[in-house]
Amino acid sequence: MEWLSQPAPLVAPALLGMVLVRQFADGLQVRAQIVETEAYTAGDPACHAYRRKTQRNQVMFGPPGHLYIYRIYGLYHCLNIVTEPEGIPAAVLIRAAQLDRLPDWIPANKQNQPARAAAGPGLLCQALRIDGSHNGWRLERAEAGQEGIWLEGSPSWQTQLSIVQTTRIGITQGAEIPWRWYIGGHPAVSRY
């Protein structure tokens, strides 16, 4: 996955349509097709690493292809994929995805709207059971009986997708930067 070492604004749209796979120790795999992303880089005031390196954001400075997981509002976790060469803090927030199946732990109110089960960064982490313990994990296929998170697919077939680029949402600084991408018309795209 050498292509993850590119700038986050190039990686973010390339992730659309790819499948994020979450494997549990019992062998269960849940696949989520990525439908919405946002890019964050060192010179961006909305980036967690904008001012300096801290204990919280240090994963963003690490090698590309690792997970940067953080908590928002004290309640929800967000999944980011670190990009750019080591030492340059940047990441792509996975804002929303379409699950291939609804795991048993998905709340009953989401069972009627399966496309909405991971339609937002917090919902995505809940659906894939990703939390702070996954911070720093490397994206790599796991052996049977082991936990893992990895990507499947290739950005090369994206010509078939209707990709929309717009400004990021849910932030106050850098909100004018058009670094949000999503698959147009997809029902799993976040609502705000």
From Swiss-Prot:
Superkingdom classification of source: Bacteria
Lineage summary: Bacteria, Bacillati, Cyanobacteriota, Cyanophyceae, Synechococcales
Keyword set for this entry? DNA damage, DNA repair, Hydrolase
Question: A single GO molecular function, which one?
Answer: alkylbase DNA N-glycosylase activity
Which PANTHER family does the protein's record reference? Answer: DNA-3-METHYLADENINE GLYCOSYLASE
Which segments does the entry list as coiled coil?
none
Concerning InterPro entries, the annotation shows:
Formyl_transferase-like_C_sf (IPR011034), MPG (IPR003180), MPG_sf (IPR036995)
Similarity section: Belongs to the DNA glycosylase MPG family.
CDD domains under this entry?
Answer: AAG
What are the BP-aspect GO terms?
base-excision repair
> Protein name, please?
Putative 3-methyladenine DNA glycosylase
Known EC number: 3.2.2.-
